Amino acid sequence: TPEAYNQAFAAFIRRTQPGGAVIACAEDAGVRALLANEDFSWIQVLTYGYSEGCAYRIQSIRWNGEGYDFSLFHTDTQKEIGSFRLSVPGRHNLLNAAGAVAVLYQMGLPAAKARASLADFSGTERRFESVCHSADTVVINDYGHHPTQLNLTLEAARELYPDHCLWAVWEPHTYSRTDAMQEAFTVALQRADRVVILPTYAARETAETDTPFQIAKNIPGARAACFDGFAEAADFVAGQAKGLNVVIVFSAGKGPQFASLLCEKLDERRQND
């Protein structure tokens, strides 16, 4: 439940030693609620984000074609820590970068170290990972299996590929998670132009539900479809992906296998065109 989820984070923060510090994202509603409703008075709670009240405030944000140039301002000293370049898209990645810089600064490490590390950072495996691309279609693997992750990744894709048709290929991860977050998944997937829902990755679960079909049905515009197998779904996407397309495969299970199959199907289509 959301309550249990929040309490798990509260318990984690309570493990901080007296006099220690927690660096928290002020742009996350869950974080804000947690800090407002729990007593962490024995530690320093330092926030980062875009807001005026943040201890570490992101400023001078500029899209650089791959990611963002930005600066970070330290409110307590009224000084700019430095300017930084991030070469991966997504405002969530920008926030993560700012949080990392804040931790280093809090530890007394020079901004130059953070600047060099961020400039070289190209992302992590299965996080907005390009699998194959051609002149018109890009296939991306992403480990997203929570509505918030889907939202942020689709937002980043829109920013990076504004002229492409955006596909969300989603492999639901466990029946229980899909049932519990049905409404949130439905809303998140609507950020895409086309939605393909793969068979649920059940993991340890056996009690099947029809929730993925209900999610597809509730996405307006008849732009979502469910499939019983990878081959059928890959054939569908390869046949429908005309013009400029970016296809993001969201999965914490067998998504990489589907992405590889789709790349093969797209290559076959190009050879036959």
Where are these regions (language model features)?
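Short internal beta-strands
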Residues: A21-A26, W167-E171, R191-A202
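Active-site glycine- and acidic-residue-rich loops that bind
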Residues: N141-L150, P172-A180
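Short glycine-rich anion-binding loops that position phosphate/pyrophosphate groups of nucleotides
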Residues: D28-A29, H145, P172-Y175, T200-A203, ...
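A glycine-rich beta-strand to alpha-helix segment
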Residues: A233-K265
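Short, flexible loop segments at boundaries between secondary-structure elements
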Residues: T200, K265-D273
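Surface-exposed amphipathic alpha-helices with a cationic face
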Residues: L154-Y161
